[in-house]
Curated annotation (Swiss-Prot):
One of its GO terms (cellular component) is cytosol. It comes from Desulfatibacillum aliphaticivorans. PANTHER family: PHOSPHOGLYCERATE KINASE, PHOSPHOGLYCERATE KINASE 1, CHLOROPLASTIC-RELATED. GO terms for molecular function: ADP binding; ATP binding; phosphoglycerate kinase activity. Disulfide bonds: none annotated. Substrate binds at D19, V20, N21, R35, H58, M59, G60, R61, R117, R150. It catalyses: (2R)-3-phosphoglycerate + ATP = (2R)-3-phospho-glyceroyl phosphate + ADP. Monomer. ATP binds at K201, E323, G349, G350, D351, T352. It is found in: Cytoplasm. This is Phosphoglycerate kinase. It comes from the Bacteria. GO terms for biological process: gluconeogenesis; glycolytic process. Keywords: ATP-binding, Cytoplasm, Glycolysis, Kinase, Nucleotide-binding, Transferase.
Length: 397
């Protein structure tokens, strides 16, 4: 797979696919521009090389309809501020008006295409739409790790038509960090897996079990593991159809010598509410009508001891309902332990990055992935469609 440094982009029309699907408030102001800042190195490199830069992205889920509230206008405005140069917003992502704008570009100019998902063809990986997108450029750069797991026209089909295709710095960096952590890790390698459902992490759990030395489990999904070994978890959310699978995973871990840690105590509540009555109880003493909302202090201490010896940490998913302050302590404790660790730490998806930002510890984490689903797909051992498309293109030429 080519990197953008490997191709000549001087004076060329360079379409850079990014994922700047950023959160907006009610007034359409950007509340977190992390994803925008993450793609700046690739854009600045292209500009320094004298390219004509065309930025393409999506925003939200407009389902193939033009939704004014999901326009790329706020993003174009933020790019203008960060790049310190004019960034013109195109009226669409394809069409004669866009084509005319591109033809008038001079070296060093920047255009931002309108929301790609205003066209259903983008979601459908439509070849004709991809061909029209590709006609705008001489070089296509995929720098959108967060959608690298999706078979969209601007991610996959476009590589069949663009003359030259390569990976941007962000995409390459994401892949390199994960590959190092999985294929050549400093050990012990500890995986922290949290979040709501075992079902959504099952593939990752199976694949990671082949690589990690220790597993740490939290979040609502821990309830399924706890019940699978006969703990009463009250009214906690449990995936009963996966109890055998959960028990089997733990047994497999034991047989191969991989430590598998589940909570020993929990913060439980009488209802799912920020102002619910709550208390800390040992796992064996969860009241029948109560539910687990967070890991308890004894569990946090146990997990801190596991992390203390770690040399590599991969974390996906919070330890509890951390968006409710009353049940955020477990996740925030883990953030603190990981941040204070000397291990190479990689954080990705499952709102874990939100917790890191909330705690103000981003600067103490080795790498925070911009991808959720894409990061999980790597944890499952899958080849990302975006990467496969770039590799096919290189093989063809």
């Amino acid at each position: 797979m080519l990197n953008m440094r490997d191709v000549d982009i001087s004076g060329k029309r360079v379409l850079i696919r990014v994922d700047v699907n950023v959160p907006l408030d009610a007034n359409l102001n950007i509340t977190d521009d992390t994803r925008i800042r993450a793609v700046l190195p690739s854009i600045n490199y292209a500009l320094d090389e004298g390219a004509k830069v065309i930025i393409a992205s999506h925003m939200g889920r407009p389902k193939g309809q033009v939704v004014p509230e999901l326009s790329m206008a706020p993003v174009a405005k933020r790019f203008k501020r960060l790049l310190k140069k004019e960034v013109e917003l195109a009226p669409d992502s394809v069409g004669p008006e866009v084509k005319a704008m591109v033809e008038k570009m001079k070296d060093g100019d920047v255009i931002m295409l309108e929301n790609l998902r205003f066209h259903q063809a983008e979601i459908d990986n439509d070849d004709a739409f991809a061909k029209e997108l590709a006609s705008l450029c001489d070089v296509y750069i995929n720098n959108a790790f967060a959608v690298a797991h999706r078979k969209n026209a601007s991610v996959v089909a476009i590589t069949r038509h663009a003359p030259v295709c390569a990976a941007g710095f962000l995409l390459q960096s994401e892949l390199n960090y994960f590959a190092k952590a999985m294929n050549d890790p400093a050990r012990p390698l500890v995986a922290i897996i949290g979040g709501a459902k075992v079902s959504s992490k099952l593939g990752a759990l199976h694949h990671m079990l082949q690589h990690v030395d220790k597993f740490v489990v939290g979040g609502a999904m821990a309830s399924t593991f706890l019940k699978s070994v006969d703990y009463n978890v009250g009214k906690s959310k449990v995936e009963d159809d996966l109890l055998w699978e959960a028990r089997s995973l733990m047994k497999r871990a034991t047989m191969q010598g991989t430590a598998f840690y589940i909570p020993v105590d929990a913060v439980v509540a009488d209802r799912f509410s920020p102002d619910a009555e709550s208390k800390i109880v040992p796992i064996r003493e969860i009241p029948p009508e109560w539910m687990i909302m967070d890991i308890g202090p004894a569990t946090a201490l146990l997990y801190s001891e596991v992390l203390a010896s770690a040399k590599t940490i991969i974390w996906n998913g919070p330890m509890g309902v951390f968006e409710m302050d009353a049940f955020s302590r477990g996740t925030m404790s883990m953030v603190n332990y990981v941040a204070n660790s000397y291990a190479l730490s990689i954080i990705g998806g499952g709102d874990t990055d939100v917790a890191i930002h909330k705690a103000g510890e981003t600067h103490r984490i080795t790498y925070i992935s911009t991808g959720g689903g894409a990061f999980l797909a790597l944890m499952e051992g899958k080849t990302l469609p975006a990467v496969a498309a770039l590799e096919r293109h290189q093989a063809k030429i």
